[in-house]
Amino acid sequence: YAHTAFVVIAGLLSLQGCSKPAAAAPATAETALGAEHISAASAVDAGRYLVKIGGCNDCHTPGFAMTNGASPAEGEWLTGDSVGFSGPWGVSYPANLRLSFQNMDEAQFIELSRAGQGRPPMPWPSLKAMSDKDLKAIYAYIKSLGAKGEMAPAALSPGVAPDRPHIPFI
């Protein structure tokens, strides 16, 4: 009898693994925009990491994408670029983030990141999905670099031909 009971219990336990798993709790705005964040020794370190993995340098640092990240040195990061991106929106140029945010406080930076109203190819959905803590870290990192470089060229309206190199999207 003990052997039969053991077999029945073992069988029931093995069937437990075949049952449908419980549904995961749905994500909430708090989870999507508040709880997830990068941890590092400091906000500046977290911001540096997010800038690196987020691809910010690919557009906002001259020569970075062309050298597969080998150059320029970190002291030259995020100074914008005069190589534009063209498409139905016209031509947009990657902003010099080090100058753009010098007169912007942290709250304004977060508001801008959440609004996401700039031209393509800026990945606004990625910024909107970041937690406030991560956006604050990016802001701290950019501010830590200090002002450097020149402002990016002004965006061009659709139909206006650029007088400098650009990457056509369409």
Language-model region placement:
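C-terminal motif of bacterial Sec signal peptides marking the signal peptidase cleavage site
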Residues: 14-17
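Short, cysteine/histidine-rich loop/knuckle motifs that typically chelate Zn2+
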Residues: 58
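Flexible coil segments in periplasmic/lumen-exposed cytochrome c-class electron-transfer proteins
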Residues: 22-40, 53, 61-92, 120-170
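Bacterial N-terminal signal peptides that target proteins for export
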Residues: 1-5
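Local sequence-structure signature of Cys/Sec-based thiol-disulfide redox active-site neighborhoods
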Residues: 48-54
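A structural feature that tracks compact, well-ordered secondary-structure segments
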Residues: 98-102, 111-113, 124-127, 144
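An amphipathic alpha-helix signature
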Residues: 106-114, 132, 136-139
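Mid-chain, structured segments of secreted extracytoplasmic proteins
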Residues: 84-107
